C-alpha cells in the first residue's frame, strides 16, 4: 500500500524513529490524518460552489449570454487548458443528456466544469482585460487590497490540494520532509486558512456560515487531538 507507506514515513519523521512504533500506532495515525482531511471537504466545496456561481453571474453580464463559456472559449487570450476544461464539460453534458431527450441549460454545463477553470480565468494575460476591471469587485467583493495575482496563486494551490484530497492522497508533496509536528501543522493550517480567506473574498455570508458551522473549531480540535496522540505515543 504505497499511500499507507507515505503516512508511516510521515509518522517516523514527526515522531522520530522508534522501534516501539507498532502497526496499531500507524493505523491510528492514518485514521487521525483522514479525520483531519474530512474538515477540508465542506470548506473546499463551499469555496468551489461560491466562486463558480460568482464568476458565472459576472460572465453572463459581461457577454450578455447564459452560455458565456462559448464566448470565452472563442477569445484569443483563452488558454489551451481553459478550452480543454470547457470542451470536456460540454462533451460530458452532451453525453449525459443524449438519452434524456431534453435540452440542457447553462447550469448543467457549469456543474461539469472543473475547479481548474477558475485559476485559468485569473491568468495574467486575462487580468488585463476589461472583465476583471468591471466585475472584479463583484466576484471578490471582500478582497480589500489583495491583488488578483495572489488570489490566482492561492486558487492554484487549492486546486492541487483538491485533487489530492479527492484522490485520497496526502495533502502535501510526498517529497516534503517534516522535522516535527509543528512543521506539519504549519503546512496543514496554512491550507485551511487559505481556503477560508478565499471564501471570505467571495462572500462574507458563506464565510460566517462556515464559522457558525464551527468548521475552523473542528479543524483545530482535530489537529490538537493529533498532537495529543503523538505526545502519548512511545
Predicted ranges, named:
Residues 1-153, 157, 172-234:
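Extended intrinsically disordered or low-complexity regions, especially N/C-terminal cytosolic tails and loops
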Amino acid at each position: 500500500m504505497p499511500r499507507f507507506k507515505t503516512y508511516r514515513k510521515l509518522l517516523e519523521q514527526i515522531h522520530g524513529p522508534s522501534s516501539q512504533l507498532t502497526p496499531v500506532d500507524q493505523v491510528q495515525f492514518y485514521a487521525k490524518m483522514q479525520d483531519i482531511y474530512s474538515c477540508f471537504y465542506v470548506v473546499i466545496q463551499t469555496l468551489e460552489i461560491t466562486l463558480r456561481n460568482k464568476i458565472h453571474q459576472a460572465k453572463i453580464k459581461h457577454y450578455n449570454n447564459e452560455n458565456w463559456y462559448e464566448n470565452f472559449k472563442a477569445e484569443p487570450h483563452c488558454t489551451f487548458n481553459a478550452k480543454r476544461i470547457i470542451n470536456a464539460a460540454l462533451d460530458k453534458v452532451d453525453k449525459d443528456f443524449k438519452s434524456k431527450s431534453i435540452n440542457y441549460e447553462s447550469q448543467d454545463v457549469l456543474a461539469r466544469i472543473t475547479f481548474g477553470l477558475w485559476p485559468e480565468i485569473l491568468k495574467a494575460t486575462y487580468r488585463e482585460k476589461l472583465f476583471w476591471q468591471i466585475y472584479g469587485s463583484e466576484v471578490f467583493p471582500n478582497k480589500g487590497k489583495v491583488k488578483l495575482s495572489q488570489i490566482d496563486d492561492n486558487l492554484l494551490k487549492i486546486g492541487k490540494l483538491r485533487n489530492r484530497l479527492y484522490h485520497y492522497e496526502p495533502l502535501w508533496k510526498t517529497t516534503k520532509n517534516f522535522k516535527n509536528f509543528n512543521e506539519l501543522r504549519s503546512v496543514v493550517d496554512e491550507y485551511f486558512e487559505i481556503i477560508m480567506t478565499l471564501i471570505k473574498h467571495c462572500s462574507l455570508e458563506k464565510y460566517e456560515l462556515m464559522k457558525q458551522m464551527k468548521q475552523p473549531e473542528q479543524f483545530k480540535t482535530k489537529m490538537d487531538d493529533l498532537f495529543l496522540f503523538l505526545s502519548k505515543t512511545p
